[in-house]
Amino acid sequence: MTIPATILDTARTQVLEQGIGLNQQQLMEVLTLPEEQIPDLMELAHQVRLKWCGEEIEVEGIISLKTGGCPEDCHFCSQSGLFESPVRSVWLDIPNLVEAAKQTAKTGATEFCIVAAVKGPDERLMTQLEEAVLAIHSEVEIEVAASIGTLNKEQVDRLAAAGVHRYNHNLETARSYFPEVVTTHTWEERRETLRLVAEAGMEVCSGGILGMGETLEQRAEFAVQLAELDPHEVPMNFLDPRPGTPFADRELMDSRDALRSIGAFRLAMPHTMLRFAGGRELTLGDKGSEQALLGGINAMIVGNYLTTLGRPMEDDLDMMDRLQLPIKVLNKVI
C-alpha cells in the first residue's frame, strides 16, 4: 500500500530541491499542520533557507526620522494622529541620524533603515532624507534603506540617486483583509509604490503584521501576494497591541501559529530574506525566537523598534552566537 505524500514531502521536492515556492492551497496545509509536526516544518524551512539563501544572518537597525502625527488610520499603529495614542510628533536632525547609524554599525549591522510616519513625503522630508543618506555614507560604512510611505516616480528616482539601496513599504496584510486594517488608503496604492521602486533598481522590501485578525486563508493569500512581488526582503511582524489604537484589545498571536507562519512564508519564498521584526519578543519569547532562527528566518532588526522596545542588542547578538549563526558583513577582511 502506497503512503500518500504529505505537504512536507511535497515541499522537500518542490521547494528544497527545485526552489519553487508553495501555492496558496499548499500553504493552507502548512498553516494547519498539527503541533507535533512543527519541529519537522522548522527543520525543513531551515534547510530551504540554507540552500537558497545561505547561512548568514543580516542584522539591521532602524530609526524614526519623523515620529507620530501620521494622517493615516492604520489600526495597529500608535503613530496615527487620528487615535488617542501617547505618541507625539517628533523630528530628528541629521547629526542624530548619523550618530545612530554609527552606533548601529558598531553592532555588526549592515543596514540602517530611516523611517517616517507619513502617508508620503513632502519636499521637506525628501530633502532631509537625501541629505541624511549622503551624510551617513560619508561617515559610516553601512547600507541605508528608507521607509517614508507612498512615493511617486520622481520621488523614487530621487531616493535611488541619493543612494538608498532598499525601500520598505509593507503591504501589511492580505488584499482581502486590508480594508479591515486601513481605510484612508488602498492596498493597491502600496502595491504601486513597490512597482516603481523595483523599476528604479532599488531592492524591494515589503512584509506586514501577522495576528491582526486575519484568517488562515488570508494569511496564505498574503504570503502568495508577497511572493508575487519577488521581494528582496520580507519583514515579519507580529501584532503588539498598542494603547489607544483600534487593535489595542486584540490578543497576541499564538506562538505555534507564529512558527507555522514563519515556516509557511519560507516555503512560499525560498529565495527571499525573511526578517524578524516587531512583536517577536512577546509572541515567541526566547525559545520561540531560537526556533524561528533555525526555522527559516535569516535576518533581524536589533535594538528598539519605532514605538516599542525590542530586546537589548547584546541579547540578540549573544543568541546568534549561541546558535552559531554567522552575521553578514559588508566587507570580509582576509
UniProtKB/Swiss-Prot annotation:
CDD domains with a match to the protein in the record: Radical_SAM
Keywords: 2Fe-2S, 4Fe-4S, Biotin biosynthesis, Iron, Iron-sulfur, Metal-binding, S-adenosyl-L-methionine, Transferase
One Pfam family here: Radical_SAM
Cofactor: record remark: Binds 1 [4Fe-4S] cluster. The cluster is coordinated with 3 cysteines and an exchangeable S-adenosyl-L-methionine. Binds 1 [2Fe-2S] cluster. The cluster is coordinated with 3 cysteines and 1 arginine.
Catalytic activity: (4R,5S)-dethiobiotin + (sulfur carrier)-SH + 2 reduced [2Fe-2S]-[ferredoxin] + 2 S-adenosyl-L-methionine = (sulfur carrier)-H + biotin + 2 5'-deoxyadenosine + 2 L-methionine + 2 oxidized [2Fe-2S]-[ferredoxin]
PROSITE patterns named in the record: RADICAL_SAM
Name by which UniProt lists this protein: Biotin synthase
Family of this protein: Belongs to the radical SAM superfamily. Biotin synthase family.
Organism: Corynebacterium glutamicum (strain R)
Subunit structure: Homodimer.
Role summary: Catalyzes the conversion of dethiobiotin (DTB) to biotin by the insertion of a sulfur atom into dethiobiotin via a radical-based mechanism.
Keyword Transmembrane: no
Binding annotation for [2Fe-2S] cluster: C113, C205, R275
Record pathway: Cofactor biosynthesis; biotin biosynthesis; biotin from 7,8-diaminononanoate: step 2/2
Gene designation: bioB
UniProt-listed GO biological process terms: biotin biosynthetic process
Keyword Kinase: no
EC code: 2.8.1.6
Entries under Gene3D superfamilies matching the protein: Aldolase class I
GO terms assigned for molecular function: 2 iron, 2 sulfur cluster binding; 4 iron, 4 sulfur cluster binding; biotin synthase activity; iron ion binding
Positions that bind [4Fe-4S] cluster: C70, C74, C77
Cofactor(s), by name: [4Fe-4S] cluster; [2Fe-2S] cluster
Classification via NCBIfam families: bioB
Domain (Radical SAM core) ranges: 55-280
SMART domains documented for this protein: BATS, Elp3
UniProt cross-references to PANTHER family, sorted A to Z: BIOTIN SYNTHASE (PTHR22976), BIOTIN SYNTHASE, MITOCHONDRIAL (PTHR22976:SF2)
